[in-house]
From Swiss-Prot:
InterPro entries: APS_kinase (IPR002891), P-loop_NTPase (IPR027417). This is Adenylyl-sulfate kinase. The active site is at S121. The lineage of its organism: Bacteria, Pseudomonadati, Pseudomonadota, Gammaproteobacteria, Enterobacterales. One of its GO terms (molecular function) is ATP binding. The keyword ATP-binding applies. It comes from Yersinia pestis.
Amino acid sequence: MPAHQLDDHNQETRSDDENIVWHPHAITRQDREQQHGHQGVVLWFTGLSGSGKSTLAGALEQALFARGVSTYLLDGDNVRHGLCRDLGFSDADRRENIRRVGEVAKLMVDAGLVVLTAFISPHRAERKMVQDMLASGQFIEVFVDTPLAICEARDPKGLYKKARAGELKNFTGIDSVYESPASPDIHLQGEQLVTNLIEQLLDVLRGRAIIKS
């Protein structure tokens, strides 16, 4: 796989292969945003397994869709059925998983969509990597801050039980580190009611003029 680098001026990911060139399009992101009636952004939900990332991202997508906002939800489990099905859970594979998702999210932002992503994404460097792919203001980090004890009590997929029994290695929060965001754009307390958290998210999006109502 050829190495890639980010162009600071237009946020294009460029290949080091001189035979591969970037083809600009006549229709711009701004044109698409005008047609959609809102900005294209990424809301990056991060937190432990069982923290409520997928639940909140799904509920927010429903709320936005009902308001006429063009959205797409990228879920950590779903992308491993196709886009990232060849990857495991080593540090290198986890980084590549997030890199691929970041590139897809960037394309969707260029299409003028509000992109919601639900990934543990345990390392700050990985989240920063995605942020650096996007223009200023296009990446909104949402930290779903739910205590480990609550996540483990929920354990919707039985993964904590397997990790505690030694049947699942490198599980974030048990034998693999989770690096909490130092200064997330949105800090949610995951024990609160989903309806309350969705209102908090909508308030931020309205305050940033990403959505109108």
